[in-house]
Amino acid sequence: IEVDKLFDDQIRFTQKLTRFPSLRGQEHTAQDFLFDELTKRNYALDRWTVNVEDIKDHPGFSPVKVDYSNAINIVGTHRPKKEMGRSLILNGHIDVVPEGPYEMWSRNPFDPAIEGDWMYGRGGADMKAGIVANIFAMDAIRNLGCLPAARVHIQSVVEEECTGNGALACLVSCLLYTSDAADEMRRG
């Protein structure tokens, strides 16, 4: 029931996030928005630019020839006063694939529209709605007054559509983001 109370807000939040054209190398404005929203929710926050030097020797690394100066990952962490139980990582990627020829769209791909039960907009389903679902699941739990007794990390990473290096950068930072379980929200 608490999730239902937040549903309209969650839809509006998803629309707002989908308006950011977070193509490869242009994710930073969407990440800024998420950082601000997680700050309002009192998460402990980390933000850093993905550094190829930190991940290039990892077997999961994919070589890149693009500039990572705007490849910013963010992590919001719920930290309980007294940590007990098992921790959790909720991971999602903020980057979207290019929209392709504009004339092939019946509407602006970065101005999400709702028709019936469907939202149309580039990146809405893959995977901005997943990131938003992670945030609003924690909102619902908090609104019930049932704060998790363990750390919960909400990760928004870049560079999933091409290489996965954004999630790898979070993995390599495992001293900060260890957990007993991890999930990447997928529709289906």
Regions found by a protein language model. Give the residues of each.
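Alpha-helical metal-binding/catalytic segments enriched in His/Glu/Asp
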Residues: 90, 114-161
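Predominant activation on well-ordered alpha-helical scaffold segments within soluble catalytic domains
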Residues: 15, 35, 132-139, 168-171
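Short acidic, glycine/serine/threonine-rich loops at helix termini
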Residues: 102, 164-169
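Single conserved hydrophobic/aromatic residue that forms the stacking wall/gate
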Residues: 177-188
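Glycine-rich, phosphate-binding/catalytic loops in enzymes
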Residues: 105-109, 170-173, 185
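Structural signature of cysteine-dependent C-C bond-forming condensing enzymes
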Residues: 145, 172-176
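Acidic/His- and Gly-rich active-site-bordering loop/insert found
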Residues: 1-119, 143, 147-148
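Generic structural signal for helix capping and beta-alpha/helix-loop junctions
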Residues: 54-55, 162-164
